[in-house]
Design a protein with these regions (language model features):
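Noncatalytic, solvent-exposed loop/strand surfaces
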Residues: 1-156
Length: 156
């Protein structure tokens, strides 16, 4: 996941964690240098981390986590969602949990707030979710659902 023009965040599950590398070109030669690496952070599996400003959000072995990207410091970790999927929609994280639940959590580096939790699908849900306007589409191997998250301001 691109952080800025020179830095990239790499995340991996199975105990690997994450790292930030800086990529640059000097004298016609490309180089990649590791800035930091943290095994216990952002161990994503079946999903990717999301970068928003100077932080990343992601499911670390199923628990939602926020990590500051300059130093690789965990800012918070809370909520169990299994190996689901996460999207950043405006200022909110839309999460499809592994168990088929839909959650909306504020994308706030200081403190997350759960705005909604709703059981939607039954069974293991690993598929990516999609957002079209205020409509959220979720599916797994057995079923598909659409949830309207219309708000007072007509957007998430």
């Amino acid at each position: 996941m691109q952080i800025d023009a020179r830095r990239v965040l790499l995340t991996k599950g199975y105990g690997q964690g994450c790292r930030v590398i800086e990529v640059g070109k000097t004298d016609s030669k490309w180089q990649a240098n590791e800035i930091w690496s943290r095994t216990p952070l952002l161990r994503t599996k079946f999903t990717s981390a999301l970068v928003d400003g100077g932080v990343a959000y992601g499911l670390n072995d199923g628990i939602l986590e926020c990590v500051e990207l300059d130093q690789g410091k965990r800012l918070w970790r809370q909520g169990r969602y299994g190996h689901g999927q996460v999207l950043l929609v405006e200022k909110n994280l839309v999460i499809a949990s592994e168990s088929g639940e839909l959650a909306v959590v504020t994308a706030d580096p200081s403190k997350p707030q759960v705005l909604a939790r709703l059981p939607v699908l039954q069974g293991t849900t690993w598929n990516p979710l999609a957002v079209v306007g205020s409509q959220i589409y979720l599916r797994n191997a057995q079923e598909m659902a659409r949830v309207d998250l219309q708000t007072d301001s007509d957007s998430l």
